[in-house]
């Protein structure tokens, strides 16, 4: 019988010193993904702004106006509800360099009423109420150019989509280690180049390149750590690898507070990727990949190194390692296999919708917080903290209660929290923060559970394909989310939350249509996957009837 890596790790250590060392190193990689995934909150922060009008600054200085008086005297008031504010995107067509203006009410000297004064575009740029800078303030991504901020964030998600779709083949073809080192090098270079980009176009190009490699590198780190540990620890290290990403969120909030200028922030969060190049000497190639390439001797050498690091010794009977042979006819998976049969088709549609919804709500809530929050740094920090209890609740519930009910409940909590936030008055900001944190915790749980359940619902020969196809909807959601958030807030600040609420509640209801996978073996065939929903007693009754039918002709 073939000796597998899992068999050897039972003797050489499934999660001992070596695996803990690898987990720490790869967890650092996971943490540095946070600034790329949600850094738009700080990089693309849009402060209060108004049109710059030549002569206003000089008049304000001559008259000794306070900032509030300058706004009241020289800037149009807010527009009607549901319309973009003229204060931000329009200015009075007035020559403020005239010496006839009075300091008390300068516009009163004009013949026409203030409400009838002609308004024009911001030809001379904007004045931003912020001590720092962002890509919005530097490249004037406001008013007619505000869609360029949406495009900036969508570009990184386009990169995620392309990179994650191709990373499986690349990592299987060239190895995990080479692929990891290549992605971190490109990610580091693109991040630094983005920080010194002279124009919006160059910044957009480097952001797209970051998207192409950053999520791919994060996924390779996930693959590596799960391949280094024994089977009993894979789920746990997978969850804690995502917890490391949450630590990255907390660090990002602190760094962004210390560095309010986007170029320095981008440069600082990109530098650690150069450190990961040292992993060439720290992290070995995956033994499982080496075996798949028939490099058994090299795989055995690495496994002996793992055992030595763990203070273990391998029995002589386990000194030879062979790849398990697949029996039966080899099947070639295709997309049609995901929709050909009724139950698997239902699973595919629900999983795709849940991946999409998880991405939209997760990224959307963070982006909306950047627009609606009073203190962007504290709000971001508090909402990131709730991801820790989310991870521990998953660990406590999925093997006790199951996957389906916690998954459905987390989606519904996220959706209900979004809807509840809409109706909380602005003077109850503390309550709004608590409800928002509940929503963030709910969607974090949903996001992590869909990663787990996706693989458990598909038979072996289409499992990888099913995970890749369904999870690609996560990146599609990320592409759409910036346009959804930033465009809808121009209509009404709370409108995105209403959309998120409906999406989350529907996702929770659809999850209840899926079978429970707790305690069930992974399906090996289409038939097993199709029968997952059926109660066991019905299956036994069907088998009994079949036996009776077979007995009748023999009498």
Curated annotation (Swiss-Prot):
The pH dependence is: Optimum pH is 9 for agmatine and putrescine uptake.
| Xref: InterPro entries | MFS_dom (IPR020846), MFS_sugar_transport-like (IPR005828), MFS_trans_sf (IPR036259), Orgcat_transp/SVOP (IPR004749), Sugar_transporter_CS (IPR005829)
Q: Where are the transmembrane segments?
A: 23-43, 151-171, 178-198, 209-229, 239-259, 264-284, 349-369, 376-396, 415-435, 442-462, 465-485, 495-515
- Notes on activation and inhibition: Tyrosine phosphorylation of the transporter leads to activation of the transport activity. TEA uptake is activated by tyrosine phosphorylation. Inhibited by cGMP, most likely through a cGMP-binding protein that interacts with OCT2.
Provide the catalytic activity annotation. Answer: (R)-noradrenaline(out) = (R)-noradrenaline(in); (R)-adrenaline(out) = (R)-adrenaline(in); serotonin(out) = serotonin(in); dopamine(out) = dopamine(in)
State how changing residue 284 to A affects the protein, per the record: Decreased TEA and metformin uptake. Decreased tyrosine phosphorylation
Q: What is the effect of changing residue 169 to F?
A: No change in TEA uptake
Which terms does the UniProt entry file under GO BP? acetylcholine transport; amine transport; amino acid import across plasma membrane; body fluid secretion; cellular detoxification; choline transport; dopamine transport; dopamine uptake
Task: State any GO CC term.
Answer: presynapse
User: What is this protein's expression induced by?
Assistant: May be down-regulated in diabetic patients.
Q: Which PROSITE patterns match?
A: MFS, SUGAR_TRANSPORT_1
Q: What is its main location?
A: membrane
In its UniProt record, a GO molecular function of this protein is:
organic cation transmembrane transporter activity
* Any matching Pfam family: Sugar_tr
**Organs and tissues of expression:** Mainly expressed in kidney, in the cortex and medulla. Localized in testis, mostly to peritubular myoid cells and Leydig cells and also detected along the basal membrane of Sertoli cells. Expressed in brain, in neurons of the cerebral cortex and in various subcortical nuclei. In the brain, also detected in the dopaminergic regions of the substantia nigra. Expressed in tracheal and bronchial ciliated epithelium in the respiratory tract. Also detected in secretory phase endometrium, in scattered stromal cells. Expressed in spleen, placenta, small intestine and spinal cord.
Annotated site (Involved in recognition of organic cations and participates in structural changes that occur during translocation of organic cations): 451
**Membrane side Extracellular: residue ranges:** 44-150, 199-208, 260-263, 370-375, 436-441, 486-494
Record PTM text? Tyrosine phosphorylated by tyrosine-protein kinase YES1.
Cytoplasmic compartment spans: 1-22, 172-177, 230-238, 285-348, 397-414, 463-464, 516-555
Q: Which domain of life is it from?
A: Eukaryota
- Record motif Proline-rich sequence, residues: 284-288
Q: What does this protein do?
A: Electrogenic voltage-dependent transporter that mediates the transport of a variety of organic cations such as endogenous bioactive amines, cationic drugs and xenobiotics. Functions as a Na(+)-independent, bidirectional uniporter. Cation cellular uptake or release is driven by the electrochemical potential, i.e. membrane potential and concentration gradient. However, may also engage electroneutral cation exchange when saturating concentrations of cation substrates are reached.
Additional remarks: Mediates the renal secretion of many clinically used cationic drugs. Transports drugs such as diabetes treatment medicine metformin, 1-methyl-4-phenylpyridinium (MPP(+)), famotidine, ranitidine, amantadine, acriflavine, amiloride, memantine, cimetidine, platinum-based drugs cisplatin and oxaliplatin, 3'-azido-3'-deoxythymidine (AZT) and tetraethylammonium (TEA). Mediates the bidirectional transport of MPP(+). Metformin competitively inhibits OCT1-mediated thiamine uptake, leading to a decrease in hepatic steatosis.
Task: Describe the family membership recorded for this protein in Swiss-Prot or TrEMBL.
Answer: Belongs to the major facilitator (TC 2.A.1) superfamily. Organic cation transporter (TC 2.A.1.19) family.
Record note on domains: Contains one proline-rich sequence (Pro-Glu-Ser-Pro-Arg) that may be involved in tyrosine-protein kinase YES1 binding and is required for the activation of substrate transport.
The protein's name in its UniProt record: Solute carrier family 22 member 2
| Organism of this sequence | Homo sapiens
Tell me the lineage of the source organism: Eukaryota, Metazoa, Chordata, Craniata, Vertebrata
Q: Which gene encodes it?
A: SLC22A2
């Amino acid at each position: 019988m073939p000796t597998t890596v899992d068999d050897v790790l039972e003797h050489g250590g499934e999660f001992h010193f070596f695996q803990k060392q690898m987990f720490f190193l790869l967890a650092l990689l996971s943490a540095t993904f946070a600034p790329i995934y949600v850094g738009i909150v700080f990089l693309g922060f849009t402060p209060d702004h108004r049109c710059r009008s030549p002569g206003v600054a000089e008049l304000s200085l001559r008259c000794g106006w306070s900032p509030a008086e300058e706004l009241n005297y020289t800037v149009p008031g807010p527009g009607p509800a549901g319309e973009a504010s003229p204060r931000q995107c329009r200015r009075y067509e007035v020559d403020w360099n005239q010496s006839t203006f009075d300091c008390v009410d300068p516009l009163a000297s004009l013949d026409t009423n203030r409400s009838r004064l002609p308004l024009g575009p911001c030809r001379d740029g904007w004045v931003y109420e912020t001590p720092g800078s962002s890509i919005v303030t530097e490249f004037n991504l406001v008013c007619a150019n505000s869609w360029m901020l949406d495009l900036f964030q969508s570009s990184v998600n386009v990169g995620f989509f392309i990179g994650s779709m191709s990373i499986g083949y690349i990592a299987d073809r060239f190895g995990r280690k080479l692929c990891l080192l290549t992605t971190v090098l490109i990610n580091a270079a693109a991040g630094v180049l983005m920080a010194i980009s002279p124009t919006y176009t160059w910044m957009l190009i480097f952001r797209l390149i970051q998207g192409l490699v950053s999520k791919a590198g994060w996924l390779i780190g996930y693959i590596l750590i799960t391949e280094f540990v024994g089977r009993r620890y894979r789920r746990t290290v997978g969850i804690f690898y995502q917890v490391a990403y949450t630590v990255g969120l907390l660090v990002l909030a602190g760094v962004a507070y210390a560095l309010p200028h986007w170029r320095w922030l981008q440069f600082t969060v990109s530098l650690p990727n150069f450190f990961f190049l040292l992993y060439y000497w720290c992290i070995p190639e995956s033994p499982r990949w080496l075996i798949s390439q028939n490099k058994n001797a090299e795989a055995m050498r690495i496994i002996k190194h793992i055992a030595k690091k763990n203070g273990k010794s391998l029995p002589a009977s386990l000194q030879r390692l062979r790849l398990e042979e697949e029996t039966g006819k080899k099947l070639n998976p295709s997309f049609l296999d995901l929709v050909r049969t009724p139950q698997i088709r239902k699973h595919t549609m629900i999983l795709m919708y849940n991946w999409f919804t998880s991405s939209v709500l997760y990224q959307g809530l963070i982006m909306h917080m950047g627009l609606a929050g009073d203190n962007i740094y504290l709000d971001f920090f508090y909402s990131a903290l709730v991801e820790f209890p989310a991870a521990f609740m998953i660990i406590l519930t999925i093997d006790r209660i199951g996957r389906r009910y916690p998954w459905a409940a987390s989606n519904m909590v996220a959706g209900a929290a979004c809807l509840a936030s809409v109706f909380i008055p602005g003077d109850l900001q503390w309550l709004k923060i608590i409800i928002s944190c509940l929503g963030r915790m709910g969607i974090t749980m949903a996001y992590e559970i869909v990663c787990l359940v996706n693989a458990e619902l598909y038979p072996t020969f289409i499992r990888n394909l099913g995970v890749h196809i369904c999870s690609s909807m996560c990146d599609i959601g990320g592409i759409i989310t910036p346009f959804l958030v930033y465009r809808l807030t121009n209509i009404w600040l709370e409108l995105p939350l209403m959309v998120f609420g409906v999406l989350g509640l529907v996702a929770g209801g659809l999850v209840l249509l899926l079978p429970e996978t707790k305690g069930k073996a992974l399906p090996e065939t289409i038939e097993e996957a199709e029968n997952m929903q059926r109660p066991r007693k019905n299956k036994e009754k069907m088998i009994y009837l079949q036996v009776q039918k077979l007995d009748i002709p023999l009498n």
